Structure formats: C-alpha cells, structure tokens
Curated annotation (Swiss-Prot):
PANTHER family, sorted: LDOC1 RELATED (PTHR15503), RETROTRANSPOSON GAG-LIKE PROTEIN 4 (PTHR15503:SF8)
Ranges annotated as CCHC-type zinc finger: 278-295
Additional notes on this entry: RTL4 is one of at least 11 genes called Mar or Mart related to long terminal repeat retrotransposons. They do not correspond to functional retrotransposons, but rather to neofunctionalized retrotransposons genes.
Keyword Zinc-finger part of the UniProt annotation: yes
Gene field: RTL4
This protein's name: Retrotransposon Gag-like protein 4
Gene Ontology terms: biological process: cognition; norepinephrine metabolic process
Signal peptide stretch: none
Its job: Involved in cognitive function in the brain, possibly via the noradrenergic system.
Amino acid sequence: MEKCTKSSSTMQVEPSFLQAENLILRLQMQHPTTENTAKRGQVMPALATTVMPVPYSLEHLTQFHGDPANCSEFLTQVTTYLTALQISNPANDAQIKLFFDYLSQQLESCGIISGPDKSTLLKQYENLILEFQQSFGKPTKQEINPLMNAKFDKGDNSSQQDPATFHLLAQNLICNETNQSGQFEKALADPNQDEESVTDMMDNLPDLITQCIQLDKKHSDRPELLQSETQLPLLASLIQHQALFSPTDPPPKKGPIQLREGQLPLTPAKRARQQETQLCLYCSQSGHFTRDCLAKRSRAPATTNNTAHQ
C-alpha cells in the first residue's frame, strides 16, 4: 500500500514533466531522420550561464510567474531553442507548431495568455516578450529576428520596412519639435520684433507710393509714345520726299515742325501737359503739386507718431 501511495503521489507531482517527455517523443516519431537527431543534439546550445533544458523550464513555468530573474532566463532559453532549429519558415513547421501548442497551454494555465488560437501563436509570443521588456525596463538580449520577420502570408516584407519607417518618422518628429520650440523661444525672447516689422512697413510706405506713381506715369505715357512712334516714319518720308524734289530751295526760317536728331515729335496733348504740370518738390514726379503728393501725406502721420512715441 505504501508503494502504491508513493507511486500515486509521484504521478500527481510531475504531470507537466511527463507532458514534456511526450512532446519530445512525438517530435522524434514525426522526424526520425539523422538530420533531426543532429538538431535534437543541438536544441539547447551552451550559454554563458548554467541553463536547464527547455522541457524542464516549461515544467517549472508556474514558479517563474512571480520572479523576474527566472522569467528572463526562461524567455532567453525559449528564444535560443527556437533560433537553434534554423527553420526558414517557422509558421508552417510541425516542430514549431507542436512547441507553441505546448507553450500556449502552459502560458494559458498560468494566466499570462488567454485563448489558444493557433493562428496567432507567433504574435502572442512576440507580445509576451515585449510586455516583459516594458515591465522590467531592461530588454533581454534575444535572437528573435527569425520569429519577428516570419509572417503567415508568404512574400510579405512589410515587417522589415515598418521598423525603418517608424525610426525615420520618430527622427522627423523630434526635428520638427526642436525647430518649433526654437522658434517659440525666439519669439518669447524678442517680443518687439513684430512692432519693428510693422514700423519698417510704415517707413517703406512712401517709397511704395512713389513707385506706384512712376508705374502709373509709364502706363499713362505709353499711348502717346506709341502714337509718336507711328507718326515718325511718315514725317521722315515726307521730309525725304521734299528734299528730292527741291534740293536747291533754302529751308524755311520758321516751320511748324522742327526735329532734332534723336528727338521725337511733340504732340499737342503732351505739350499742354508739360506746360500745365510741374515736377513735385517732394517725390520729383510730375502730374501733381507738392501739396497733393500722396507720399508726403503718408509720411507725415508716421513722423508725428514717432515723435509722440519718443
């Protein structure tokens, strides 16, 4: 009776260890080749610290639930175990599926992961490692690149591009924040900058008005210039015709039209305008008197404001 009770107690104490042995036996039965035997020999490569085999770690998973150091050691062993298999497509491999089935059952029993959905086992394992790193603040050095790059859809390389894209976006965000903060600090340090810019605009207003007057004068004089340009060839041909028919006749002393070299004929409208208007003494432009100069009017309030401000 004592032997029977002892045997029954041992059966109750080590159920997960027997499950781990059954897992290894199933893996050996499914892959009885020499290549797999060589892989089984190097399932757990030697680490710098003393490492327990993976089934033994899986058996004691309930003890690692509250101890960060033991949990870190366990995750390192699991990652090393999966990396040592050197499988090109872990999502469709039988060994990986069996291992994650067992891992999912153990994690679900400990309350770490809920739901043994086989289509998301790889994603659940990645989330477990990320949550562990964030909770303790010290990321473990793990070789998880084959698992992180593995996708259920073949030919999908977006997982390799996402980290680089996220890194570039983070750098651009930091640069934009730095530039904006620098501009904001400059604006706070120099609050009179806006007032100076407004004052500069008010000081330049007379010059702008003078330029507008010059442009308006050019546009107003353009039809007269065009009219004189059209009359010049006719006058030149008329003079040449008179010289051919009467070369010996002396020129008249007084004529209605007298042209010099390089001088355009003066139309009656232009002559009347020159007689009536004088140059402005303020902006040196014609077409208005000094008392009506817009530049003088715009500069006068600015001068009075500056004297009052001083």
